[in-house]
Amino acid sequence: MENPFEITAVVAREILDSRGNPTVEVEVYTPVSMGRAAVPSGASTGTHEALELRDGGKRFHGKGVRRAVENVNKIIAPEIIGMDVTWQRDIDMLMIELDGTENKSNLGANAILGVSLAVAKAAANALGLPLYQYIGGTNAYVMPVPMSNVINGGVHAGNELDFQEFMIMPVGAKSFREGIRWVSETYHTLKKVIAEKYGKNAVNVGDEGGFAPPMKEVTEPLEVLIKAIEEAGYKPGDEIAFALDAASSEFYDEKLGKYVVGGKEYDRGELLELYRELVSKYPIVSIEDPFHEEDWEGFVMITRELGGKIQIVGDDLFVTNPKRIRKGIEMGAANALLLKVNQIGTLSEAIDAAYTAFRAGYGVVVSHRSGETEDATIADLAVALNAGQIKTGAPARSDRNAKYNQLIRIEEELEGIAVYPGKRFRNPFL
């Protein structure tokens, strides 16, 4: 009798992401199911991330992924066909071994991750389980508070804002569905407020669906957001709070050894003072990458100073890498991890990274990348981990809303059980 969980075929192809760049899509088949996954890609990338394999040359301006696709079809597929699709960790470890490098540069993290996620989906489908339940078990019931990136700066935008993301979090809502409604209403009010102040051309959207108006000072977006939240009928701070992603590796000047914000130079202490001022003046509950990816000392300082009051998130600092997360925990650098599956390259390692963070009392924010697809795996992953937080862009563009819509479905499925943590987003169980 045939084994319903045996992998019978693996197919990879090149598709387009939300920026029109190629990315890898993988399908994994068993006699009773199919799992399909598409791989995201980032614009502001940490130096220590697992390597995304690109072809180079003229085709797609060098961004083709035919090599990664071929690595799936010719190298990975023959090795995993015949294996049990529920052996997630064995399959992930086998691919890591096949690759043989620390940063997955041989086969490509985009090849390996595509297979890893498609395997999980095929297994969930074979068992007739939703993906969040397959990964997280029966205890997966915490809905994430969205961190919605509504104003863009940095490498995601064409304006002069140095901080990359100005986000809103509906911390006062009673459910995910209510929270996402608040975000949507605020987003549309924000569009009107920006158009009135900066003109109609200022409401074009960036990679993640946020607006990129011609702002320069870091306080400008925060003032505009306060106005939009109030005009939408909500209370800044109490109902809708702010989260920032400074992405400061992007504005750190190595030659000067200084951070350049709004044309002004700041050393570590001065930048910390700027954050302190912003946190005292505005309802900011989370700051991501406040210092550059090797400024461990800066992270330790801000965590000591502000970590009791707000969340300090490591993204480029940790790159979802358990070694770097452990170093941060030992030093007391940051108090939360930004979890991006494509930074590490397999589902098993991403889950390990999350649990390393949880065990140390760190928060975990499950995150998209700026180059996304209609794949909504991270919505299921956020619930599977009971992370309590998700970062997946503005409520605009189908690639972002695919995740929000999946979370609406999951909350409906978990009716009567689902918990929306609100202000307890960092430690949903406290």
From Swiss-Prot:
Residues engaged in binding Mg(2+): 245, 288, 315
Residue numbers binding (2R)-2-phosphoglycerate: 164, 340, 369-370, 391
Active site positions, chain numbering: 208 (proton donor), 340 (proton acceptor)
EC code(s) of this entry: 4.2.1.11
InterPro entries per the UniProt record, alphabetical: Enolase, Enolase-like_C_sf, Enolase-like_N, Enolase_C, Enolase_CS, Enolase_N
Primary enzyme class: lyase
Cofactor notes: Binds a second Mg(2+) ion via substrate during catalysis.
Gene Ontology CC annotation, any one: phosphopyruvate hydratase complex
Record carries keyword Cytoplasm: yes
Subcellular location(s) of the protein: Cytoplasm; Secreted; Cell surface
UniProt main location, coarse: cytoplasm
Reactions mediated catalytically: (2R)-2-phosphoglycerate = phosphoenolpyruvate + H2O
Gene Ontology BP terms: glycolytic process
Keyword entries, A-Z: Cytoplasm, Glycolysis, Lyase, Magnesium, Metal-binding, Secreted
Listed Pfam families: Enolase_C (PF00113), Enolase_N (PF03952)
Cofactor(s) recorded in Swiss-Prot or TrEMBL: Mg(2+)
GO molecular function list: magnesium ion binding; phosphopyruvate hydratase activity
Pathway recorded for this protein: Carbohydrate degradation; glycolysis; pyruvate from D-glyceraldehyde 3-phosphate: step 4/5
Transcription regulation recorded as keyword: no
Function of the protein: Catalyzes the reversible conversion of 2-phosphoglycerate (2-PG) into phosphoenolpyruvate (PEP). It is essential for the degradation of carbohydrates via glycolysis.
NCBIfam families assigned to the protein according to its UniProt record, in alphabetical order: eno
Family to which this protein belongs: Belongs to the enolase family.
Identification of the protein by name: Enolase
UniProt organism field: Thermococcus gammatolerans (strain DSM 15229 / JCM 11827 / EJ3)
